[in-house]
Amino acid sequence: MNNKKQNNEDIKTKINLLSKSFGFDVCKITKPEIPSQIQEQFQKFLKNNLYGEMDWLKKTEYRRKSPINLWSEAKSAIVLGLNYGPKDNPLLKIKKNDLGNISVYANGEDYHKVFKGKLKRFASKLFPILNKDKILDLKVFVDTAPLLEKPLAQLAGLGWQGKHTNLVSKEFGSWLFLGVILLNKDIPIDLPENDHCGSCKACLDICPTEAFICLLYTSPSPRDS
Protein backbone atom coordinates (compact mmCIF):
# COMPACT_ATOMS: atom_id res chain seq x y z
CA MET A 1 0.00 0.00 0.00
CA ASN A 2 1.46 3.36 -1.03
CA ASN A 3 1.79 6.24 1.41
CA LYS A 4 -1.12 8.26 -0.03
CA LYS A 5 -3.54 5.33 0.14
CA GLN A 6 -2.38 4.50 3.67
CA ASN A 7 -2.84 8.13 4.71
CA ASN A 8 -6.38 8.13 3.27
CA GLU A 9 -7.27 4.99 5.21
CA ASP A 10 -5.78 6.48 8.37
CA ILE A 11 -7.94 9.61 7.94
CA LYS A 12 -11.12 7.55 7.48
CA THR A 13 -10.26 5.40 10.50
CA LYS A 14 -9.65 8.44 12.69
CA ILE A 15 -12.91 10.09 11.59
CA ASN A 16 -14.87 6.90 12.26
CA LEU A 17 -13.32 6.37 15.68
CA LEU A 18 -14.02 10.00 16.54
CA SER A 19 -17.66 9.63 15.48
CA LYS A 20 -18.06 6.57 17.72
CA SER A 21 -16.66 8.50 20.68
CA PHE A 22 -19.49 11.03 20.25
CA GLY A 23 -22.13 8.31 20.14
CA PHE A 24 -22.86 8.23 16.42
CA ASP A 25 -23.80 4.81 15.09
CA VAL A 26 -22.62 5.23 11.52
CA CYS A 27 -20.30 7.66 9.74
CA LYS A 28 -19.63 7.68 5.99
CA ILE A 29 -18.13 10.09 3.48
CA THR A 30 -19.17 11.09 -0.04
CA LYS A 31 -18.83 13.88 -2.57
CA PRO A 32 -21.29 16.79 -2.19
CA GLU A 33 -23.20 15.86 -5.32
CA ILE A 34 -26.80 14.89 -6.01
CA PRO A 35 -27.27 12.44 -8.95
CA SER A 36 -28.99 13.91 -12.01
CA GLN A 37 -31.78 11.32 -11.68
CA ILE A 38 -32.63 12.57 -8.17
CA GLN A 39 -32.51 16.17 -9.36
CA GLU A 40 -34.94 15.33 -12.17
CA GLN A 41 -37.30 13.57 -9.73
CA PHE A 42 -37.24 16.60 -7.46
CA GLN A 43 -37.96 18.93 -10.37
CA LYS A 44 -40.89 16.74 -11.42
CA PHE A 45 -42.20 16.77 -7.84
CA LEU A 46 -42.18 20.57 -7.85
CA LYS A 47 -43.53 20.91 -11.39
CA ASN A 48 -46.54 18.76 -10.47
CA ASN A 49 -47.20 20.91 -7.39
CA LEU A 50 -46.91 17.93 -5.05
CA TYR A 51 -45.47 20.07 -2.27
CA GLY A 52 -48.87 21.37 -1.13
CA GLU A 53 -48.44 24.52 0.94
CA MET A 54 -44.74 23.95 1.60
CA ASP A 55 -43.72 26.82 -0.66
CA TRP A 56 -40.19 26.93 0.70
CA LEU A 57 -39.39 23.77 -1.27
CA LYS A 58 -39.99 25.68 -4.49
CA LYS A 59 -38.18 28.76 -3.22
CA THR A 60 -35.07 26.75 -2.32
CA GLU A 61 -35.10 24.54 -5.43
CA TYR A 62 -31.71 25.72 -6.74
CA ARG A 63 -29.89 25.14 -3.45
CA ARG A 64 -31.52 21.74 -2.89
CA LYS A 65 -30.32 20.44 -6.26
CA SER A 66 -26.72 20.37 -5.08
CA PRO A 67 -24.85 20.96 -1.81
CA ILE A 68 -22.41 23.02 -3.87
CA ASN A 69 -25.25 25.39 -4.70
CA LEU A 70 -25.77 25.72 -0.96
CA TRP A 71 -22.07 26.28 -0.26
CA SER A 72 -19.78 26.73 -3.26
CA GLU A 73 -16.61 25.71 -1.38
CA ALA A 74 -17.90 22.25 -0.44
CA LYS A 75 -15.68 19.37 -1.58
CA SER A 76 -16.69 16.53 0.74
CA ALA A 77 -19.69 15.52 2.83
CA ILE A 78 -19.54 13.51 6.04
CA VAL A 79 -22.93 11.89 6.65
CA LEU A 80 -23.67 10.60 10.15
CA GLY A 81 -26.49 8.47 11.49
CA LEU A 82 -27.84 8.30 15.03
CA ASN A 83 -29.94 5.25 15.86
CA TYR A 84 -33.19 6.06 17.67
CA GLY A 85 -34.76 2.63 17.38
CA PRO A 86 -36.94 1.64 20.38
CA LYS A 87 -36.30 -1.37 22.60
CA ASP A 88 -39.87 -2.62 22.15
CA ASN A 89 -41.94 -3.01 19.00
CA PRO A 90 -44.01 0.22 18.76
CA LEU A 91 -46.65 -1.51 16.62
CA LEU A 92 -47.75 -3.53 19.65
CA LYS A 93 -48.96 -0.34 21.35
CA ILE A 94 -51.24 0.51 18.43
CA LYS A 95 -53.43 -2.47 19.31
CA LYS A 96 -54.26 -0.80 22.64
CA ASN A 97 -57.12 1.44 21.58
CA ASP A 98 -57.47 2.99 25.03
CA LEU A 99 -54.01 4.56 24.83
CA GLY A 100 -52.65 7.39 22.75
CA ASN A 101 -49.49 6.78 20.75
CA ILE A 102 -46.64 9.16 20.11
CA SER A 103 -44.26 8.61 17.22
CA VAL A 104 -40.95 7.17 18.42
CA TYR A 105 -38.90 10.06 17.07
CA ALA A 106 -40.93 12.51 19.19
CA ASN A 107 -40.73 10.61 22.48
CA GLY A 108 -37.51 12.25 23.63
CA GLU A 109 -35.93 15.67 23.35
CA ASP A 110 -36.06 17.58 20.07
CA TYR A 111 -33.64 15.55 17.95
CA HIS A 112 -32.61 18.63 15.97
CA LYS A 113 -31.11 20.17 19.10
CA VAL A 114 -29.61 16.95 20.46
CA PHE A 115 -28.13 15.86 17.14
CA LYS A 116 -26.86 19.31 16.17
CA GLY A 117 -25.13 19.68 19.52
CA LYS A 118 -23.35 16.36 19.01
CA LEU A 119 -22.53 17.26 15.42
CA LYS A 120 -20.98 20.61 16.32
CA ARG A 121 -18.82 19.06 19.04
CA PHE A 122 -17.75 16.28 16.67
CA ALA A 123 -16.99 18.80 13.90
CA SER A 124 -14.77 20.87 16.19
CA LYS A 125 -12.56 17.82 16.73
CA LEU A 126 -12.05 17.28 12.99
CA PHE A 127 -9.62 20.18 12.75
CA PRO A 128 -6.59 18.34 14.22
CA ILE A 129 -7.23 15.44 11.82
CA LEU A 130 -7.89 17.37 8.61
CA ASN A 131 -6.30 20.79 9.02
CA LYS A 132 -2.70 19.84 8.31
CA ASP A 133 -2.24 21.22 4.81
CA LYS A 134 -4.74 24.07 4.45
CA ILE A 135 -7.33 26.13 6.29
CA LEU A 136 -10.30 23.89 7.01
CA ASP A 137 -13.81 25.24 6.94
CA LEU A 138 -17.03 23.32 7.43
CA LYS A 139 -20.80 23.65 7.74
CA VAL A 140 -23.10 21.54 9.94
CA PHE A 141 -26.66 20.55 8.94
CA VAL A 142 -29.47 18.67 10.69
CA ASP A 143 -32.68 18.63 8.67
CA THR A 144 -33.31 22.39 8.75
CA ALA A 145 -31.33 23.50 5.67
CA PRO A 146 -32.19 23.09 1.95
CA LEU A 147 -30.16 19.90 1.70
CA LEU A 148 -31.29 16.51 0.34
CA GLU A 149 -29.88 14.36 3.15
CA LYS A 150 -31.29 10.99 2.07
CA PRO A 151 -29.68 10.95 -1.40
CA LEU A 152 -26.39 12.00 0.20
CA ALA A 153 -26.77 9.23 2.78
CA GLN A 154 -27.26 6.66 0.01
CA LEU A 155 -24.24 7.97 -1.90
CA ALA A 156 -22.19 7.69 1.29
CA GLY A 157 -23.36 4.11 1.89
CA LEU A 158 -25.60 4.50 4.95
CA GLY A 159 -28.60 2.91 3.24
CA TRP A 160 -31.13 3.48 0.48
CA GLN A 161 -34.46 5.28 0.23
CA GLY A 162 -37.31 2.82 0.62
CA LYS A 163 -40.78 2.92 -0.87
CA HIS A 164 -42.01 4.55 2.35
CA THR A 165 -39.62 7.45 1.50
CA ASN A 166 -37.37 6.89 4.53
CA LEU A 167 -33.75 5.78 4.46
CA VAL A 168 -33.36 2.04 5.03
CA SER A 169 -30.18 0.75 6.64
CA LYS A 170 -29.26 -2.94 6.61
CA GLU A 171 -28.18 -2.63 10.25
CA PHE A 172 -30.59 -0.06 11.69
CA GLY A 173 -33.67 -0.31 9.50
CA SER A 174 -35.45 3.04 9.21
CA TRP A 175 -34.34 4.21 12.65
CA LEU A 176 -31.61 6.70 11.78
CA PHE A 177 -31.54 10.43 12.34
CA LEU A 178 -29.29 11.98 9.70
CA GLY A 179 -26.80 14.81 9.93
CA VAL A 180 -24.36 16.21 7.37
CA ILE A 181 -21.08 18.09 7.60
CA LEU A 182 -19.86 19.81 4.43
CA LEU A 183 -16.13 20.50 4.24
CA ASN A 184 -13.92 22.52 1.92
CA LYS A 185 -11.41 19.66 1.75
CA ASP A 186 -11.20 16.50 -0.35
CA ILE A 187 -11.20 13.43 1.87
CA PRO A 188 -11.49 9.74 0.91
CA ILE A 189 -15.05 8.63 0.19
CA ASP A 190 -17.04 5.46 0.86
CA LEU A 191 -18.95 3.32 -1.63
CA PRO A 192 -22.64 4.09 -2.26
CA GLU A 193 -25.41 1.70 -1.20
CA ASN A 194 -27.65 0.01 -3.75
CA ASP A 195 -31.44 -0.12 -3.61
CA HIS A 196 -32.36 -3.53 -2.17
CA CYS A 197 -36.16 -3.14 -2.13
CA GLY A 198 -36.89 -4.95 -5.38
CA SER A 199 -40.58 -5.92 -5.46
CA CYS A 200 -40.87 -5.86 -1.65
CA LYS A 201 -43.46 -3.42 -0.27
CA ALA A 202 -43.58 -4.60 3.34
CA CYS A 203 -43.08 -1.07 4.63
CA LEU A 204 -46.21 0.06 2.76
CA ASP A 205 -48.33 -2.93 3.75
CA ILE A 206 -47.53 -2.72 7.46
CA CYS A 207 -48.14 1.02 7.92
CA PRO A 208 -51.29 1.22 10.12
CA THR A 209 -52.34 4.65 8.84
CA GLU A 210 -50.98 4.58 5.28
CA ALA A 211 -49.30 7.86 6.19
CA PHE A 212 -46.91 8.23 3.31
CA ILE A 213 -47.01 12.02 3.34
CA CYS A 214 -44.16 13.75 5.15
CA LEU A 215 -45.12 14.43 8.79
CA LEU A 216 -43.59 17.87 8.43
CA TYR A 217 -46.54 18.81 6.26
CA THR A 218 -49.09 18.23 9.00
CA SER A 219 -47.13 19.16 12.11
CA PRO A 220 -44.64 22.05 12.37
CA SER A 221 -45.11 23.44 8.87
CA PRO A 222 -46.39 27.02 8.75
CA ARG A 223 -49.83 26.88 7.18
CA ASP A 224 -50.16 30.54 6.25
CA SER A 225 -46.60 31.53 5.34
Predicted regions and their residues:
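Residues immediately flanking
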Residues: 80-82, 209, 222
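Auxiliary alpha/beta "docking" domains used to position bulky ligands
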Residues: 1-196
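Single conserved hydrophobic/aromatic residue that forms the stacking wall/gate
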Residues: 217-225
